[in-house]
């Protein structure tokens, strides 16, 4: 069966542009810094902290054990990704095992013409 292009490729382009837009939006949300900004134009404390000089004192909330918290979140993030991948593999294996056409999909026969290639 020869591959032929779709009669109207505009839908393909619309889907590609929509997917690219969603990826860019997701990247912007995940990468950009949305933390509150504290301080003035000379003394900026975006992640909390304390600044003192002769005439000015700025104290802003600093998370306790920020570095150990970020390490814990990174470890749990890696574990979550591993469990999602393992779950997807298990789901695909289960779908293959319990599918109605298991005889055809597990053999080396072509699904379309039932011949060996």
From Swiss-Prot:
It is found in: Host endoplasmic reticulum membrane. One of its GO terms (cellular component) is host cell endoplasmic reticulum membrane. Pfam families: Plant_vir_prot (PF01307). The keyword Transmembrane applies. Residues 1-11, 100-117 are cytoplasmic. InterPro entries: Plant_vir_prot. This is Movement protein TGB2. It comes from White clover mosaic virus (strain O).
């Amino acid at each position: 069966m020869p591959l032929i292009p779709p009669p109207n490729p505009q839908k393909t382009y619309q889907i590609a542009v929509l997917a690219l837009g969603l990826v860019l939006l997701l990247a912007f949300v995940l990468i950009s810094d949305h933390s509150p900004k504290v301080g003035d134009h000379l003394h900026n404390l975006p992640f909390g902290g304390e600044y003192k000089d002769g005439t000015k004192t700025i104290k802003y909330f600093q998370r306790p054990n920020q570095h150990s918290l970020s390490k814990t979140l990174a470890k749990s993030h890696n574990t979550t990704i591993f469990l999602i991948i393992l779950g997807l593999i298990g789901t695909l294996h289960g779908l293959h095992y319990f599918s109605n056409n298991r005889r055809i999909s597990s053999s080396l026969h072509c699904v379309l013409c039932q011949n060996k290639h």
